From Swiss-Prot:
One of its GO terms (molecular function) is rRNA binding. It holds the Pfam family Ribosomal_S11. InterPro entries: Ribosomal_uS11, Ribosomal_uS11_bac-type, Ribosomal_uS11_CS, Ribosomal_uS11_sf. This is Small ribosomal subunit protein uS11.
Length: 131
């Protein structure tokens, strides 16, 4: 018997009207991920260098982080976002570029905080590369 054509109807994203939110920038050696949330932590928008089509070593560049932050900021500003607190995590190259890009997109930055986790001598790090 033939399967009935069942189409899933996708809901249209509603505008949330949020004035103040948080931007979480995770910048690793391989990629940069920017997530913009409301004050509670519910995600409004996100973007990453890999999601924008950057592949391989180009994902870890400051330009890729800048583009990711710009894309996430424009999507969040459609929800009425005007000001953000920025939380930066990781040692990557795109940290400062992403922050500057958020400011250039028209968002007012009220706080910049480094939340990189620092071990109190926890796990053993990977061995040094000998190239």
């Amino acid at each position: 018997m033939a399967k009935a054509n069942t189409r899933k109807t996708r809901r249209k994203k509603e505008r949330k009207n949020i004035e103040h939110g948080c931007a979480h920038i995770k910048s690793t050696f391989n990629n940069s991920i920017v997530t913009i949330t409301d004050a509670v932590g519910n995600a409004l928008s996100w973007s990453s260098a890999g999601a924008l089509g950057f592949k391989g070593s180009r994902k870890s560049t400051p330009f890729a982080a800048q583009m990711a932050a710009e894309t996430a900021a424009t999507a969040a500003m459609e929800h009425g976002l005007k000001s953000i607190e920025v939380y930066v995590k990781g040692p990557g190259a795109g940290r400062e570029a992403a922050i500057r890009s958020l400011q250039a997109a028209g968002l007012e930055i009220t706080l910049i905080k480094d939340v990189t986790p620092i071990p109190h001598n926890g796990c053993r790090p990977p061995k040094r590369r000998r190239v």
